[in-house]
Regions:
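Catalytic Zn2+-binding segment of zinc metalloproteases
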Residues: 40-57
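Extracytoplasmic and endomembrane cell-envelope/extracellular-matrix remodeling and assembly machinery
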Residues: 91-92, 97-170
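Short alpha-helix carrying the canonical HExxH Zn2+-binding catalytic motif
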Residues: 28-44, 64
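Catalytic zinc-binding patch centered on the HExxH motif and its immediate surroundings
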Residues: 2-14
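Short pre-active-site segment immediately N-terminal to the catalytic Zn-binding motif
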Residues: 17-34, 94-99
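Membrane-active amphipathic alpha-helices enriched in small hydrophobic residues
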Residues: 60-76, 83-92
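Acidic helix-start/capping segments at beta-turn-to-alpha-helix junctions
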Residues: 1-4, 54-62, 125-132
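Acidic/histidine metal-binding catalytic segments
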Residues: 52-56, 79-81, 116-126
Length: 170
């Protein structure tokens, strides 16, 4: 995609989109491959389909949360009580997103290693992403992020790579 921002995504039907910024910000093939392996993991783990199923499961909980917050707002004469229900719903959706991201990191890392790439490639790419975020001044609170905070992802990836041989890797 003709866009200089660092991004890639997986979509239903086996589609992976890659912004031009990935080419600009990956220092080597292994780092580029780490992003693709992450996106392929979203597809292989059926995250889009599982998210739809989870949304169905959450619909009853969501309805109860909204009814409760409306009742609380009416009985307490505090309209801000509605925000509690909305915050709960958003938190539940983000929780599933973060779980899927962590799973995609883990499965993507395993596939990256099986493909013969340097185990440190994923952590190094996360460092690049974190550096770009800092330069852009983008640091929303972690509870608002769909992706785990980059420093957490860097640590997880580097710890997974610890002790794995870099010899003979791409």
């Amino acid at each position: 995609i003709d866009d200089s921002s660092l991004n890639a995504f997986a979509a239903p039907g086996g589609i992976i989109g890659v912004n031009g910024g990935l080419f600009l910000n990956a220092d080597n093939e292994g780092q580029f491959a780490s992003v693709l392996s992450h996106e392929l993991a979203h597809l292989s783990q059926r995250h889009f389909a599982r998210n739809i199923l989870n949304a169905k499961d959450r619909s009853l909980t969501s309805s109860l949360a909204m009814i409760s917050s409306i009742a609380l707002a009416l009985t307490s004469s505090n309209p801000q009580a509605l925000a509690v229900g909305q915050a709960f719903l958003q938190t539940q959706g983000l929780r599933y997103s973060r779980l899927f991201e962590k799973e995609a990191d883990r499965v993507g890392f395993a596939n990256l290693i099986r493909a013969g790439y340097d185990p440190k490639s994923m952590g190094e790419m996360f460092e690049n992403m974190n550096d770009l975020r800092k330069l852009a001044g983008e640091a929303p609170p972690e509870f608002l992020l769909t992706h785990p905070l980059s420093s957490s992802r860097i640590n997880d990836a580097m710890n997974a790579a610890e002790g794995l041989s870099r010899e003979g890797t791409k």
